[in-house]
Amino acid sequence: MSRFFVSGYPSDSSSEEEDLLSSSEEELLSSESEEDNFSSDSEFGNDSDNDSSDSDSDGAPSGPTYFLKKDFMKGSGDGSDSDSDDEGRKVVKSAKDKLLDDMRDSIESINTAKRVGNWTNILAEFEKLGRLLIKVGQQKIGTPNFYVKCLANLEDYINETVTNEKESTKKMNATYSRAFNTVRQRVKKQIKEYQSHMDLFRTKPELFETEEPLEGIASTIAGAPQLNGDEDSNAFTSVGAKTFSPIFTTLKQISETRGKKNIDKVEQIQTLEDLLNDTSSTGTPFELISIYQMLLSIRFDASSNQSFMPIDQWKKNEADLNSFLQLLKSKSKEYQVSELGTVTDDIDIEPPANADGVKVVFGSIASLIERLDDEFTRSLQYSDPHSIEYIQRLKDESIIYKLIVKGQLYVESTTPVEIRSKHEAGQLFRIVMRRLEHIHYKPNQLIAANETEAWKNIDTNVDSTIVPRNSDPNDLVVGLADFLTQNAKSIYGKNALLCSIYYYAINNQYVKARDLFLSSHIYSTIHNSESSLQVMYNRALVQLGLSAFKAGVIEESHQALNEIANSQRLKELLGQGFNSKYPSQATTAEKQKLLPFHMHINLELLECVFMTSSLLIEIPAMAAVSSSSKDSKRKASLKSFKSKLDFHERQYFTGPPESIKDHVVHSSIALQKGDWAKAYKLLSSIKIWKLIPDNEQLLSMMKKQLQVEGLRTYIFTYKSIYTKLSIAKLSAIFDIEKESVYSIIDKMIQPGDISGSIDESKSFVNFTTNDHQRTKLQELAIVMNEKVGLLTEKNEKTASNGYSRKQPMQQQQQQQQQQQQQKEQKELLHEENNRFRYANVNANNDEFQTTA
């Protein structure tokens, strides 16, 4: 057999079948090789094979396959004598020896890479070494001594590299730097896991020079007699692994399995609940704090794959969170839980005490309360809003509000005053924002009731430094919003500002809400904000328009509601549903963006208010347009409202009004004829007005507005017929006092809406007809004249290569001034229009709409 092919098949590259040979097979092979040097290399050799191999070896090799290795040929059992002599005895390694040899090879590769500073290779080999170490643990071999030595040497080399990098002017390249940082972190983690081994190596390195397993060394050091079997492994565990108390042993086991697949979280929760019950009276405060934090977190994790947290688990978490806060309050001079705390190396290590002697444990009360509140909101989102279950669930809102107030008081006590305006106070900002979100949409009476209930079980000597107890609702909202606006980062400040606007608007403080909205200029930056803030902005804008209507400021109400009420995505813009897709097609993330039903703005009320304000504005405007010769080219500002009237007029038969739209259209037709009483009767019969508190006051305001706008419509419509009108008669027709009629007509005369005057006795209004009433032919001739003028100017520009005739310098300056004035007017008009433009909710990230 050719020596070239034989040497190409070393024992190190043997197959996995060789690694899995049993000890009996190894002994059989070694005995056979000792008894007969000319026996076959095959593990299946027997007497008949030996006979055949002897006979086969007599002949010379022949045939096209004579050079192939006989071990791989079916039925071959002979081995070349010369090859066996040259190669020596074949060594078959066990799986254990091969695994340890692979680890030694990886360590040698790491040492080679260390000499040249190749951190990429070090990282690759260290990862390979880690995988081999896992196999070592699976086969219960024990931690090899050379692995501990490798960790120690690698730690020393890392520290040396760090020192050299600080002193050297030439920095490590980016690839090596990333690999170095990764190796540094993983070595640190491994050293932490094998800390007892490392300490032993640092004190007595000579013990690790032998190949003896560490179990024997550990038992010798411990002064215990050498044991065999399972007792020996237990002796190693006592020295090699860190000893935990029974409580922290359980917590450590649960912590290591969190996030892994096929873990029974219900069993973990039950284990922690039993542990809490057993140690509630005997455990140390630090043990109880650790149990509470893990139990609350795992309960939340258990419901992460569900639509919402089961109500029984939610109530358990709420009760445990209250107990947790009570524990922290009773041990406030010894322990605190805060995001400003120090993270310890292990779960059972207590943090060092600060200057006041308090140990600050790392944790977040604010995050736990936020998560509980989010689960409460999710349960409302997935419940039928018209069911009894929704009403029963909504009663828990007062429970979560109590918890938020308690949490705010605790976080205030653990957050130093000097950092409240910094980023470190984020937990305080978040919980204050939660409190504001729970009250900003409620009327004052309900806020006062919630506050009374929340402070009932809190000690009288405990008070908030942000907003003191027993503050009235207005001071409460202002105090919370001012704290966030002045101290927190922009997102909390903007959200607090919008909550304040919404609160003022819903509690009939329209002037404050409008001034705050306009002075903040939030409308200029809202389009770059996140979706939740844009939804809050749209809600505040709608509530501002409704408040303006209730205050009788019809034009501002119409201006605020104009764009958003005509939008095809009204539900999406307000976070109340989906217009562009069916609810079943919405993703979970999209559903979670929606608001619970009890926070919704009634869309029918919004439509009714907008159409009523459009009626009060557009009917007089259309009458003025149709009767004015000067403004004959002016169009009504709202085509959609006029189109509703035109559509109604084209119908052959119209029944009595049924919907809100029908009532408003019939009321508009009556108002066009000056019949304000019929218009009021139709509008007041709409049942949606009963949803507004003090609706009698609202209907009284609407009656006055209809009387005034009916008077103006009547004058615009019939001014060309009358030359004189009695103010007393107008007062009787529209049920308005004479002084009010005189004031209304005077306001129409001054800007030139009508041509006329009031006599000295203030009894009559005289209409003048100085303006010649143009015929239809004359109006068409005027329009044609304007178009001919434009055509002439275009022809002149064409004849002069795009330039018009040169005008005198003075005329050019006048035109420039006019253009500048027009530009300024357009900018002012554009800014005015943008003030009440709704935010197009998250059009970039496609969170609310199907097309981005």
UniProtKB/Swiss-Prot annotation:
Polar residues bias: start-end ranges: 798-809, 841-852
Lineage of the organism: Eukaryota, Fungi, Dikarya, Ascomycota, Saccharomycotina
Tagged with keyword Phosphoprotein: no
Residue intervals of the PCI domain: 597-772
Composition bias type Acidic residues, residue spans: 14-57
Keywords attached to this entry: Cytoplasm, Initiation factor, Protein biosynthesis
Pfam families, per the entry: eIF-3c_N, PCI
A GO molecular-function annotation: RNA binding
Compartment(s) of residence: Cytoplasm
Gene3D superfamilies: Winged helix-like DNA-binding domain superfamily/Winged helix DNA-binding domain
The species this protein was found in: Debaryomyces hansenii (strain ATCC 36239 / CBS 767 / BCRC 21394 / JCM 1990 / NBRC 0083 / IGC 2968)
Annotated protein name in UniProt: Eukaryotic translation initiation factor 3 subunit C
